[in-house]
A protein has these predicted regions:
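Feature activates predominantly on carbohydrate-active enzymes
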Residues: 32, 95-316, 357, 361, ...
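Short, compositionally stereotyped local motifs that mark structural "simplifiers"
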Residues: 4, 27, 492, 496, ...
Length: 750
């Protein structure tokens, strides 16, 4: 879920955060609908319908339709008891599907029918998108549509950095526009308490402010809060009136707001105000778990949840349940007594005891508990719903056990990750999740039986905010990736197509920017690499997120200009070494974005035998196993791409080239991703041998990367030489303590 929060503040890349709309003028065929999410069925007809100068609708028509048409068309919109045959809205229970609607535009006018009020509201958003695209002259068509999943959510963490309520209101407006219907509000965590408790006022007085907006400085050094009103204090909390405003606005839009109160872990901010709720009975840097042995803890939890339920009518209440350190429970007399009394064998069962007890309380108030997938550990509460973030395994297990699940895997829908290569991007929380990767996600695992698939309620995108300091940056990370989430949770899998979606989303970007949303402007170049061992070559295929952009490239490492070769779709073939540099241009002018650099080598080591002398790879990061470091495949900017091999021990391998070979250059690339405990090797050494017994060192290289570097770093350890050998041995030292990784993608031999 949170994925290792050891982080450092960096200055934002302002040109990118501005989201310049001047570069988003892609022209598609005039007959292509640009609707997001894509409807289940669209039947086009010849002709069009022109909106009358005065729009008349029935008095009970949705207010969102009246307001939206007036804003988009500038026309006068009036209401009457009878309405007009030219613009009719109806409730028709015969319409099939969850939140189903039917939109008919003919020469006679517009008829919008919904299965219920929710379906009618979804149809309103579709009609307004059509008006936004076509103006007052709408194409004749019939759209029949309904939702694939009931739960289509977005989570925003406001604990690590406080986000004002007006930003939340804007986000809700955009969510409704794209048929997203659940807003998960992560209100409290170790970064600060944002919920206004009347019974426990010290929570906002003593745990809502700190003296720095630098997350690493706060989290790694002292984790100290300051009192409200301290000069220079950073933070904030919501008033009860602000929460009511958000909930009421969301309700009008058809969105449910789900509050989250973290427990029993991620609770160190609570102890700044009420230290007696910890096992030690005092604030402590390493204390982040509530004491489950004390009855006082449960009184506190029930009191807070009662106040939460007063303000939030949501059926679901999220209680967190993730990443409890459990480092004090085993030695805490109160927790040990609880375990003995309840017959609990370990700390996992102790946490499960708390979750079950909290669930029973919520159920008694007519609510349901939802938690992160760690609540599976130690036994799942009877009626709990699981939010699966550590991959899909937890969600699969819960669904197979008959529990409802919301899929939110970090691999695809964590929006705190970089969305393009990190150069020139504002700092992100490690990882690499492009728009395409998010769009590719299918929330229904194939391993589930049909009877189990019904327990997958939907999916959710999460934005954790360690490095997201303000609302503009939050919008930059959310948009347009939540549009991909909207389509993957609403549209049938059979109608989804990423190239088609990409063309449509490029039309929505300038609209988002015109509405004041600071959306990421989609300017990435992707490189697809394929190794063909039969032809002894590597092919490189390029694609851009901007369909209207031109890609110019070179293969000698020089910077492309408009006179450089333009990529036209045919793969670039590499039979030895290529230093590819590619850049985006628009109408002959370079875009203000760093070029991408990519190296491909069909080298002498590809396919040769490799032996791991002491330690093999970590089972979580095998890449291609024993073939990974000699397969010609280079890793992407994320350690999660399956192309980087990870070890928690020193890397020591021997490569057999099959015969004594002329050697001119050997190099290996390593990654540092400090946030994820991945560090550069302190030293890399190359040794050579003709017989596999007697080795000679041809050089050692020490890393040039500081362990304090917070951004992803890629360093190549290079060994030029004029040698002959059959065996090549590479040793890379892991200087860090147990549990820290070294990651490498390829050993290149020339």
């Amino acid at each position: 879920m949170k994925l290792l929060r050891v982080l450092r503040h960096a200055t934002l890349a302002l040109p990118l955060l501005l989201g310049l709309s001047s570069e988003s003028s892609y022209a598609a065929p005039t007959d292509s609908l640009r609707l997001i999410p894509r409807p289940a069925s669209v039947v086009r007809a010849e002709g069009s319908y022109t909106l009358p100068k005065t729009l008349v609708m029935r008095r009970n028509a949705p207010e969102s339709l009246r307001r939206g048409l007036a804003q988009l068309t500038g026309r006068r919109v009036t209401v009457s008891s009878q309405g007009s045959r030219r613009l009719r809205t109806l409730i028709d229970p015969r319409i099939a599907g969850r939140e189903g609607y039917r939109l008919e535009i003919s020469s006679e006018g517009i008829t919008l029918s919904g299965r219920d009020q929710t379906g009618l509201q979804q149809g309103v958003q579709t009609l307004l998108q059509l008006v936004e695209q076509y103006g007052d002259r709408l194409p004749q068509l019939t759209i029949t549509d309904s939702a694939r999943f009931a739960y289509r959510g977005v989570m925003l963490d406001v604990s690590r950095h406080f986000m004002r309520s007006d930003m939340i209101l804007r986000l809700l407006d955009e969510m409704a526009r794209y048929k997203l219907n659940r807003f998960h509000w992560h209100l409290v965590d170790g970064g600060g308490w944002r919920f206004p408790s009347t019974k426990y006022p010290l929570l906002t007085k003593k745990a809502a402010y700190r003296m720095t907006n630098d997350w690493d400085s706060f989290w790694q050094k002292d984790r100290k809060f300051v009192d409200e009103g301290t000069p220079g204090a950073y933070g904030g909390y919501y008033t009860r009136a602000e929460i009511r405003q958000v909930v009421e606005h969301a309700t009008r839009l058809g969105i449910t707001v789900i509050p989250e109160i973290e427990m029993p872990g991620h609770s160190n901010e609570i102890f700044a105000a009420y230290p007696e709720l910890s096992c030690k009975g005092r604030w402590d840097f390493e204390s982040s778990d509530m004491c489950i042995g004390k009855e006082q803890t449960f009184r506190f939890v029930e009191d807070i949840l009662s106040e939460v339920m007063e303000l939030f009518p949501s059926r679901y209440i999220h209680i967190g349940g993730d990443e409890a350190a459990m480092n004090h429970w085993g030695s805490c007399p109160d927790c040990r007594r609880r375990m003995e009394q309840e017959g609990l064998k370990d700390e996992h069962e102790l946490q499960s005891y708390m979750i079950r007890r909290v669930e029973k309380y919520l159920n008694s108030k007519g609510r349901k508990l939802i938690g992160w997938d760690e609540i599976l550990m130690g036994g799942l509460a009877p009626d709990a719903t699981v939010m699966s973030w550590r991959g899909e395994e937890g969600g699969i297990a819960a669904a197979q056990a008959g529990h409802d699940v919301i899929m939110t895997p970090g691999s695809h829908v964590y929006l705190d990750f970089y969305q393009r290569e990190s150069d020139g991007e504002p700092r992100a929380n490690g990882g690499f999740t492009t728009l395409e990767k998010t769009y590719s996600y299918n929330p229904t695992p194939a391993v589930l039986k049909e009877s189990e698939q019904k327990h997958i309620l939907g999916a959710q995108a999460n934005l954790w905010t360690e490095y997201v300091l303000d609302e503009r940056h939050a919008e930059y990370m959310l948009f347009p990736r939540i549009l991909a989430l909207a389509e993957l949770t609403w549209s049938p899998q059979s109608v989804r197509s990423y190239p088609d979606f990409l063309a449509r989303v490029n039309h929505h970007l300038p609209r988002l920017q015109q509405r004041g949303i600071n959306a990421y402007p989609l300017r990435r170049i992707a490189v697809d690499m394929q190794v063909d061992s039969l032809k002894r070559q590597i092919t490189l295929s390029l694609s851009a997120e901007r369909p209207d952009a031109e890609i110019h490239y070179t293969i000698d490492g020089t910077e492309p200009t408009s006179a450089s070769p333009r990529y036209e779709g045919r793969p670039i073939i590499c039979t030895d070494s290529v230093l590819l540099v590619a850049k985006l241009f628009h109408e002959g002018n370079p875009l203000d974005l760093p070029s991408i650099h990519y190296r491909a080598d069909y080298h002498k080591g590809i396919g040769k035998k490799i032996t791991y002398n002491e330690h093999s790879w970590n089972s979580k990061y095998p890449a291609g196993g024993e073939r990974a470091l000699l397969d010609g495949v280079r890793g992407t900017p994320t350690y999660l791409d399956g192309k980087w091999q990870g070890l928690t021990k020193p890397l020591d391998v021997t490569i057999d080239l099959g015969e004594v070979t002329e050697l001119r250059h050997i190099f290996a690339r390593f990654m540092q991703e400090r946030i994820q405990w991945v560090y550069m090797p302190g030293e890399v050494e190359i040794l050579l041998s003709e017989d596999g017994v007697n080795y000679r060192s041809v050089g050692k290289r020490t890393t040039q990367t500081s362990e304090e570097e917070y951004k992803p770093v890629f360093e190549t350890f290079s060994f030029p030489m004029r040698e002959r050998a059959r065996y090549v041995r590479l040793r890379a030292a892991n200087n860090r303590s147990a549990g820290h990784f070294i990651f490498t993608d390829e050993i290149v031999i020339w």
